[in-house]
């Protein structure tokens, strides 16, 4: 399909919001049989990185879009900007914790985004926040993201990749790489870990975030630890409900604890001052990730051929219209184009060079640095 014709079919799907979980199409009973049938021939411990799903089990967006939505898709308060607006270091760390929690989004059980193709990009703006993401490596699937806040002089970079493993009763997705936020007005750097994703089939189907997240700022000697509680039977028996979060803020050097963090990331999260006993709500999910809107096209001519919403537009349109044969055929076209590009590069001896990031492999780890200091305004915007 010619590029100009593809532009006419640009599909911008709505991000998954809290209220969408009540949609009957997303209930576990509607997908569990299809999923189990897919894994009949898959052995426990198998790497599922390149496992291909039928369109019926795909969300109408790529993995790269999902990463971007964690940063640019929100309603209400600009939580990223708040990280730099606070006067005291402890208040800034609390704001970074709040923003980090806000990047956690509901996961649709049994449904998965498309595997982003090499060179795919996603460029969206929301107010003063500009985000560019790029698929910089295909095997393993390494994604890089750069976001800048024009007004508050904030720089966010992600370099991450995931390794899904089939464990018999569940799929365990370990998200590797790092996230770094720089508050340039305060000369502070915050390094963050990432939680794991669990897709459980038995005994009760469900999808949830789990594991430990650390947030550390060397310049202020402050650190936070967040524990996302797994939705296992044992944890529920202990009284830890689905999507609960517990943690603490403390001084790195002394270990002196300053705050307790507790609550549910899909509802409210509280912070308790250890010294004064004062309680405050630091995050309200309903105010931030309810009623999310898709981007709109501000400048069609600036939408590039590598833009996620263009690469997958035919597939997404087929899924949204439940035209599964059309979606399947369109998905094959995208995959064949990817293979043809690889074959052409191998024949000519060319190496793939990302457009927006410098990528370095260090042993088994990857590091991605943006080539430009700031992200320009995007042709796709949140209004």
UniProtKB/Swiss-Prot annotation:
Coiled coil: none annotated. GO terms for biological process: lipid transport. InterPro entries: OSBP_sf, Oxysterol-bd. Signal peptide: none annotated. May be involved in the transport of sterols. Belongs to the OSBP family. This is Oxysterol-binding protein-related protein 4B. It comes from Arabidopsis thaliana. The lineage of its organism: Eukaryota, Viridiplantae, Streptophyta, Embryophyta, Tracheophyta.
């Amino acid at each position: 399909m010619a590029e100009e014709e593809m532009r006419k079919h640009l599909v911008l799907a709505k991000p998954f919001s809290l209220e969408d979980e009540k949609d009957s199409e997303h209930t576990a009973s509607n997908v569990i049989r299809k999923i189990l049938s897919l894994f009949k021939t898959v052995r426990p411990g198998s790497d599922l990185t390149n496992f291909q799903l039928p369109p019926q089990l795909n969300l109408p967006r790529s993995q790269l879009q999902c990463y971007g939505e964690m940063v640019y898709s929100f309603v209400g308060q600009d939580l990223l900007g708040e990280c730099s607006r606070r006067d005291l270091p402890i208040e800034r760390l609390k704001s970074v914790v709040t923003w980090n929690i806000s990047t956690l989004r509901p996961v649709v059980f049994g449904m998965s985004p498309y595997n982003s193709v090499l060179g795919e990009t996603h460029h969206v703006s929301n107010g003063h926040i500009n985000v560019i993401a790029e698929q910089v490596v295909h095997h393993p699937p390494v994604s890089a993201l750069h976001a800048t806040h024009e007004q508050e002089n904030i720089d966010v970079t992600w370099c991450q990749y995931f390794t899904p493993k089939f464990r018999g009763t569940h799929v365990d997705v370990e998200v590797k790489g790092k996230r770094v936020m720089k508050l340039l007005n305060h000369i502070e750097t915050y390094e963050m870990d990432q939680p794991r994703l669990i897709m459980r089939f038995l005994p009760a189907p469900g999808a949830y975030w789990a594991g430990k997240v650390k947030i550390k700022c060397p310049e202020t000697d402050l650190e936070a630890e967040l524990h996302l509680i797994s939705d296992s039977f044992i944890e529920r028996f202990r009284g830890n409900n689905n999507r609960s979060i517990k943690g603490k803020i403390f001084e790195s050097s002394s270990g002196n604890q300053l705050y307790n963090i507790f609550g549910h990331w899909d509802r409210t999260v509280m912070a308790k001052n250890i010294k004064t006993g004062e309680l405050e709500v630091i995050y309200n999910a309903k105010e931030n990730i309810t009623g999310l809107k898709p981007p709109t096209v501000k400048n069609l001519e600036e939408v590039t051929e590598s833009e996620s919403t263009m690469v997958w537009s035919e597939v997404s349109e087929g899924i949204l219209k439940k035209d599964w044969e059309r979606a399947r055929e369109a998905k094959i076209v995208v995959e064949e184009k990817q293979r043809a590009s690889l074959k052409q590069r191998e024949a000519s001896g060319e190496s793939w060079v990302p457009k927006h990031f410098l990528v370095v492999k260090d042993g088994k780890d990857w590091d991605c640095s943006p080539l430009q200091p700031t992200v320009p305004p995007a042709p796709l915007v949140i209004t």
